[in-house]
Amino acid sequence: MAVRGLKTIYVALKDASGQTLMGKDGLSESGVYEIDTNKANGNLGSRTANISNLAGSTTKVSGNNQVVDVEVGDAAPTVTIDSNAINPTVMQKLLGREQSASGAWIPKDGVTESALIIETQERVTGQRVWFAFGRGIMTQSSQNVQTDTDTAKTPEDDNLTFTAEGYQPWNNKTFATYYEGDAKTNIANVFKDVFPGSSFTPAGATTQGGAGAPKPGGSAGGSASQPGGH
């Protein structure tokens, strides 16, 4: 799908049953956290969210001196996210770290699962498009710390990689796409599908899809950009 721009990114932590963690166990009181551009929330928005491996590898099957079939493997998406800044507490929780009594963030044993929605817009109509991943893990492969100079500052962005896993509500497929212009698309259901159990309700959730649906930007059930306690 031809899209333009990166409007925002939503994330949440999941428990072993696939439900969204909320409050002190999650990323916000509602469970859903928006990586917005509000400095008061510790965020500076995101530059890119590059999605790869949306299709599995293909293997030709030959017989009688001709190609008789093609086998297609399952998709194994990864998303590389480049954010200018993510709230530090949220960042640590996404990476599966827990805080000690002394304040240190230490990697936990096992895997911390999360979910992800990337919101963009269709290139021609400007209607919203959501790339959704109901289950996966976030990792950070490196941290490049450089000195400032007498003429320039050298900040490093928050760079994350999301590796998608099979999601049972989608027949164990790894991703889904929603388009605002589709009459069947209900904004509330997009978030219910990806973040089940969350109290977060995007603005416009009562609209039953379609081109006139208002744009989400708030929560009736809890802030999407106030980190939960720890």
Task: Tell where the protein language model's regions lie, with residue ranges.
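Exposed beta-sheet edge/beta-hairpin loop segments within beta-rich domains
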Residues: 70-72, 105-109, 146-156
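Mixed-charge, glycine-accented linear interaction segment located at domain edges/termini
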Residues: 136-215
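Charged, amphipathic alpha-helical segments
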Residues: 86-108
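Oligomerization/assembly interface segments of phage tail-like spikes and tubes
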Residues: 66-90, 154-167
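Short helix-loop boundary/capping segments
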Residues: 107-145
